[in-house]
Design a protein with these regions (language model features):
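Post-HExxH zinc-binding segment in Zn-dependent metallohydrolases
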Residues: 210-244
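A conserved beta-strand element that flanks and buttresses the S-adenosyl-L-methionine
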Residues: 186
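Pan-zinc metallopeptidase signature
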Residues: 245-311
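Hydrophobic/aromatic-lined pockets within catalytic cores
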Residues: 191, 195-199, 227-235, 263-267
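Fold-level signature of zinc-dependent metallopeptidase catalytic domains
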Residues: 2-24
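Post-HEXXH active-site segment of zinc metalloproteases
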Residues: 180, 195-224
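Active-site scaffold of zinc-dependent metalloenzymes
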Residues: 75-181, 190, 196-202
Length: 311
C-alpha cells in the first residue's frame, strides 16, 4: 500500500521525518500559543474554566491524498520529487565545476580525458529529471485536495492532528525544512483553535455550529493571518520560516491565500476587532466579513483623527 511505501521513503533518511516533526511541534507549541493569546487577546482557559486543545503527530495519509499519489507512474518519481532539494544542489555543483573545469583540472594536475563530456551528460540527466518531476507538480497535487492533508483541527473534540507523512513529502518537494513546515502547520491549526474557542473579555467564544458553517475564506483566512504573523515575528531569528510560509502559500487554493487581499491593508488590531465582531454577530458570509473590517477601519481612523495629539 502507498502508506507503507511513503513510510519507507521518509524513514530511510539520516533522521526519521516523524521524529523531526514531533520535535519541531513540541518546541513550537508554547511559543505559538503565547503569540496567539497576545495577538487575539483571547484565552482558551480562565480560572473558572479549564479547556485544553492537545495536538498529536499521527501516522497515515488521507484517502484522497493516497488516491492522488497512486496515480504516479513509478515510485521513483515520488522519491525524486521528495529529494528535489538534493537534485537542485547537485545541478548547481555540476554547473560550478563545468564553468571552471579548466582551472579545476589544472589545480588537481589532471588531464581532461572526457570529464567535460561526463559533466555535460550529468547536467543533462539532472535537468531532464527536474523537468519531469516539475510536470507532475507534487505540491499542487497534494495541496489542492479539498481536505486537511498536513494537519487538522477537530473542533468538536477539540484537538489537533499533525500528519507527518504529507509534511515530509511537501517539505521535500518545496525545498523547505521539515522543521519549518511542521511549525507552520501547527501554528495554523492552533490559530483555528484560538479563534474558535478563545474567550474574549466578556467570556464569549465562537459558537461551534457557527464556526463550522462560516465561509472558509473567513476561517482559513484568519488562521493564515495569525500564522503569517508569528512567522514575521520570528523572522529575525529564523528568516527561513517566513520564506517557507510564502513558498507554501504559492501552491495553496484561494481560501488559504485570499487573506493577503486584506492582511496588508489593515492593522492587526482591525483584524482582531473584526474577528470578535464576526463571532459575536454570527457572520457567515465573506462579503459581510470584509464589510465589517472596512467599517472598523473607518471608525478607528475617525477616532484617531479627532483625538488630540500627545505633545
Amino acid at each position: 500500500p502507498m502508506e507503507s511505501r511513503i513510510r519507507h521513503l521518509l524513514s530511510s533518511q539520516k533522521v526519521e521525518t516523524q521524529s523531526i516533526v514531533e520535535k519541531a511541534c513540541k518546541q513550537a507549541n508554547l511559543a505559538v500559543r503565547e503569540y496567539l493569546r497576545d495577538e487575539t487577546a483571547l484565552k482558551i482557559s480562565h480560572p473558572g474554566r479549564r479547556q485544553t486543545v492537545p495536538f498529536q503527530v499521527v501516522d497515515g495519509l488521507p484517502r484522497s491524498l493516497e488516491q492522488r499519489l497512486e496515480q504516479l507512474p513509478e515510485d521513483i518519481f515520488l522519491f525524486l520529487m521528495q529529494s528535489r532539494h538534493l537534485l537542485n544542489q547537485g545541478h548547481s555543483a555540476l554547473q560550478l565545476l563545468d564553468k571552471n573545469l579548466h582551472q579545476v583540472l589544472q589545480a588537481f594536475e589532471a588531464e581532461d580525458s572526457g570529464e567535460k563530456i561526463g559533466l555535460n551528460k550529468s547536467l543533462k540527466l539532472i535537468e531532464n529529471v527536474l523537468d519531469k518531476i516539475n510536470l507532475i507538480k507534487l505540491p499542487e497535487l497534494i495541496l489542492n485536495i479539498n481536505e486537511d492533508v498536513m494537519g487538522a483541527y477537530f473542533y468538536k473534540i477539540p484537538g489537533i492532528q499533525i500528519y507527518w507523512m504529507p509534511i515530509g513529502l511537501i517539505a521535500g518537494a518545496l525545498d523547505i525544512t521539515v522543521d519549518d513546515l511542521s511549525f507552520i502547520v501547527l501554528a495554523h491549526e492552533l490559530a483555528h483553535a484560538y479563534t474558535h474557542l478563545g474567550l474574549d473579555i466578556d467570556k464569549i467564544q465562537w459558537q461551534t455550529e457557527m464556526f463550522a458553517n462560516t465561509n472558509l475564506m473567513i476561517v482559513e483566512g484568519l488562521a493564515q493571518f495569525y500564522t503569517e504573523g508569528i512567522c514575521k515575528k520570528l523572522e529575525p531569528n529564523n528568516p527561513k520560516l517566513l520564506k517557507a510560509f510564502y513558498k507554501l502559500l504559492d501552491h495553496q487554493p484561494p481560501p488559504y491565500t485570499h487573506f493577503r487581499e486584506w492582511a496588508d491593508k489593515h492593522a492587526s488590531e482591525v483584524v482582531r476587532f473584526t474577528l470578535i465582531a464576526t463571532r459575536s454577530n454570527n457572520i457567515l458570509k465573506y462579503d459581510q466579513f470584509l464589510n465589517i473590517m472596512n467599517d472598523i477601519e473607518e471608525k478607528i481612523l475617525h477616532v484617531d483623527g479627532v483625538l488630540p495629539s500627545e505633545e
